[in-house]
């Protein structure tokens, strides 16, 4: 199945954030490397930039929003799970036009693609809790049918 431009952007953002989390390289350096990555030409570049730079810029705020939904300190998570959760937290708070279920589903798929064998289950559980806090009206409406 062909990946959407938005999915491709999220995959590249995950790779870029993984690199940033491990190396703390400047975002411009990460940008340059991503431009040479497979699939860059098919990505929604505006979304990729918004996510990558937004997560790096607002890292501390996103971690603060995410922390109450975690069962352990964020630095004990794998870098892949951290990157995926930070992307989803950024999208939940900044891309309110995107339904929360879409954001969670995309995050689960990223965790399946890049993470450990059961990491996607953890990501799903954390984001369900987080979405209920960040988007209570939307999540309640979905639960009420």
Swiss-Prot record:
Write down a Pfam family by its short name. Answer: NusB
Record key words, sorted: RNA-binding, Transcription, Transcription antitermination, Transcription regulation
Q: Please give the SUPFAM superfamilies that the UniProt record associates with this protein.
A: NusB-like
One Gene Ontology MF term? RNA binding
State the Gene Ontology BP annotations.
DNA-templated transcription termination; transcription antitermination
Extract one GO cellular component term from the record.
cytosol
Superkingdom of the organism of origin: Bacteria
Instruction: Extract the Gene3D superfamilies matched here.
Output: NusB-like
Record-linked HAMAP family: NusB (MF_00073)
> Which family does the similarity line name?
Belongs to the NusB family.
Its biological purpose: Involved in transcription antitermination. Required for transcription of ribosomal RNA (rRNA) genes. Binds specifically to the boxA antiterminator sequence of the ribosomal RNA (rrn) operons.
This protein's name: Transcription antitermination protein NusB
What would be the name of the gene that encodes this protein?
nusB
């Amino acid at each position: 199945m062909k990946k959407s431009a938005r999915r491709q952007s999220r995959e590249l953002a995950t790779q870029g954030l993984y690199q940033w989390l491990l190396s703390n390289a400047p975002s411009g350096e990460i940008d340059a490397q991503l431009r040479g990555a497979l699939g860059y030409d098919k990505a929604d570049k505006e979304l990729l930039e918004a996510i990558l730079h937004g997560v790096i810029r607002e890292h501390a705020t996103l971690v603060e929003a995410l922390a109450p939904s975690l069962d352990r300190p964020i630095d004990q998570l794998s870098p892949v799970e951290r990157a995926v959760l930070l992307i989803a937290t950024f999208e939940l708070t900044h891309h309110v036009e995107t339904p929360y279920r879409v954001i969670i589903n995309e995050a689960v798929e990223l965790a399946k693609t890049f993470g450990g064998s059961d990491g996607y289950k953890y990501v799903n559980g954390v984001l369900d809790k987080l979405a209920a806090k960040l988007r209570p009206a939307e999540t309640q409406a979905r639960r009420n049918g």
